[in-house]
Amino acid sequence: MTLTVLTIVIIVGAYLAGSVSSAVLVCKIRGLPDPRTQGSGNPGATNVLRIGGASSAALVLFCDMLKGAAPAYLAFRLGVDPIALGVIAIAACLGHIFPIFFGFKGGKGVATAFGAMAPIGHDLALCLLASWIVLVLVTRYSSFAAICTALLAPVYTWWLDDRFTIPVAMLSTLIVIRHKDNIKRLLKGEESKVSRKKT
């Protein structure tokens, strides 16, 4: 099997893996409400935190990150070129955002994108994670933190390993576009802040 064919197989596999909605499955297994019909309506870790608590949200976060990290790391180890690596990462995110197994109604793709970027290096992963955490703690807006971190990601990548600046910029653009409704709500002061289920 040539590297080109293998890359295409990984792209398809990345989309299918991304299409497995961790939030919906975790909530179903744990007897929680469907995140697509509760809270913000977004099947992601932040909404699961609101309706199901920290442990469920952490499990969703881990699974969503793994969906991006696994195909990206595999492609990285096989020597796939940076642009194709970016396409693979985007395929995983598109699977999360438009999941074929869940009526093409998915999440924002933030955790999956982070997972896809992580194989580039620990330094980048730490910079992204630190930026998101600081912004959430300061503003209490998960969406604002995600948007700002996505915008910072290509800058961090250029600084740490410029070979991957373009694919990371591709991912960041997708994340920002996916948050267009959040941006509108932020500008109107109508965006929900991060909260957790009270026990």
Curated annotation (Swiss-Prot):
Matches recorded under SMART domains: G3P_acyltransf
Xref: Pfam families: G3P_acyltransf (PF02660)
Subcellular compartments: Cell inner membrane
Signal peptide as annotated in the record: none
Keywords recorded for this protein, A-Z: Cell inner membrane, Cell membrane, Lipid biosynthesis, Lipid metabolism, Membrane, Phospholipid biosynthesis, Phospholipid metabolism, Transferase, Transmembrane, Transmembrane helix
Gene Ontology terms, MF aspect: acyl-phosphate glycerol-3-phosphate acyltransferase activity
Recorded superkingdom: Bacteria
EC number of the protein: 2.3.1.275
Residue ranges crossing the lipid bilayer per the database entry: 5-25, 56-76, 83-103, 118-138, 141-161
GO cellular component terms given for this protein: plasma membrane
Membrane topology category: Multi-pass membrane protein
Catalytic activity: an acyl phosphate + sn-glycerol 3-phosphate = a 1-acyl-sn-glycero-3-phosphate + phosphate
Protein's pathway: Lipid metabolism; phospholipid metabolism
GO BP: any one term: phospholipid biosynthetic process
InterPro entries for the chain: G3P_acylTferase_PlsY
HAMAP family: PlsY
Subunit structure: Probably interacts with PlsX.
PANTHER family: GLYCEROL-3-PHOSPHATE ACYLTRANSFERASE-RELATED (PTHR30309:SF0), INNER MEMBRANE PROTEIN YGIH (PTHR30309)
Full protein name: Glycerol-3-phosphate acyltransferase
GN (gene name): plsY
